[in-house]
């Protein structure tokens, strides 16, 4: 709709946009550069780095974060205890725990590996944990991340069906007792509590290779480059103030992109607090004007590594040629 509106010169003054798409539309000239206009706003220094960077292109700011989420590791406490395991903190521990909890009809681990943006969302934390970037995958670190996913499938610790599973499908497998650990986000927590009230589970940081990493999800405010930029900014300054964000952010199921608000969220909810902790390691997808093409290349590399269409090394080289 935003593209159609731009073509017809019929755009609103302010939009809410999925964070990985922000840079693409900024590159089209749809959004105004507000860098200088908001630099002295109260609380502008309170934003987490990841969410704020998702509003940027070439170091220029084209909006502000609305609300954020990220990915973490969910685990079935009973299954891990029965296998004599604790929640993994490293890749080696992840592979070990996944193998030990793979028994009968239960596989140890699952994550969405669809060949689309959802799959990329779930793969990038493993890529970034090695120190690699989304733009440079044809190296030892990029191949290592693809190999991790392939090894989990080859060991039987993760079903090959993950190439067909959405994040919702993964959650359903988890609450049905078919998997011991999964990658997922905070938006699943209310559903899990409602549909599986007797299931014993917890959340922890995604296991790391060289460093902790997670992928940022959420939405941003984008200011349209039109006649009403100043009016849009007046509203944005109000809507993104500390007190206003605190008044509505929980209703949207988001973690606040402002640290001074996020730190006061979920004070009685240890599970959601884990996601707030994970936010400090969450990175945006991009920001890059050609992110959709980059994302397609990354998710294809994961798919080909899992299915055996390509080796991780060949899949990385193919992805790099597109990127």
Spans of features found by a protein language model:
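Extracytoplasmic "Venus flytrap"/periplasmic binding protein-like
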Residues: 1-47, 78-89, 180-181, 191, ...
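A structural signal for short loop-to-beta-strand junctions that line the ligand-binding cleft
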Residues: 4-5, 12-13, 41-79, 107-108, ...
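Hinge/lid segment of periplasmic solute-binding proteins
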Residues: 18-70, 95, 101, 119-122, ...
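Periplasmic solute-binding protein
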Residues: 20-30, 50-87, 112-134, 215-222, ...
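Conserved C-terminal helix/tail region of periplasmic/extracytoplasmic solute-binding proteins
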Residues: 81, 154, 277-323
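Extracytoplasmic/periplasmic substrate-recognition and gating elements
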Residues: 82-83, 147, 154-157, 188, ...
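Glycine-centered hinge/linker elements that transmit conformational signals in sensory
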Residues: 97-102, 135-163
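Long, aromatic- and glycine/proline-rich binding clefts that accommodate carbohydrate-like moieties
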Residues: 197, 201, 249-297, 304
